[in-house]
């Protein structure tokens, strides 16, 4: 688990949720640091809040992550969580260290449940075997997947 300023996290990929009708705290921080780029790209359709829509950007302004992976959350339903998270991780595959901001994705769910589900999906992604018939020979899976813990969820670190 990692904490601190999400904009200063040096990682291969930062997976950020985009709910319908608003922004998560991490998306807001990225929007502010980039002088409104996130909001403009949502309006332009480059980033879409529909469930399962993914947009990947390299060298995002104001962020130290190599890539920022925006994942559409729709109306933030628990039933979509695993599928959406898997899409985010699959699109962050080139990042050797991936940071998930999933504790912000479902504000009405218990943070411990979100952390447990995130861990399950992350372990599945790290353990999947390389199948060179299916994937390109240069395909690289993440070496490490961390859960970002915002300050208001510090008690989740203990769980």
Language-model regions, residue ranges each:
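Glycine-/small-residue-enriched capping loops at alpha/beta junctions
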Residues: 1-159
């Amino acid at each position: 688990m990692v904490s601190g300023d999400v904009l200063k996290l040096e990682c291969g990929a930062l997976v950020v949720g985009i709910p319908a009708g608003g922004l998560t705290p991490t998306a807001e921080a990225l929007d502010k640091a980039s002088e409104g780029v996130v909001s403009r790209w949502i309006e332009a359709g480059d980033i879409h809040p529909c469930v399962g829509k993914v947009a990947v950007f390299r060298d995002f302004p104001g962020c130290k992550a190599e890539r920022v992976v925006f994942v559409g959350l729709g109306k933030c339903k628990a039933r979509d969580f695993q599928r959406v998270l898997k899409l985010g991780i699959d699109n962050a595959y080139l990042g050797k260290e991936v940071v998930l901001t999933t504790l912000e994705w479902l504000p009405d769910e218990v943070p411990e449940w979100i952390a447990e589900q995130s861990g399950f999906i992350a372990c599945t992604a790290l353990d999947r075997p390389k199948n060179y018939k299916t994937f390109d020979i240069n395909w690289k899976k993440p070496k490490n997947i961390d859960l970002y813990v915002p300050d208001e969820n510090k008690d989740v670190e203990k769980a």
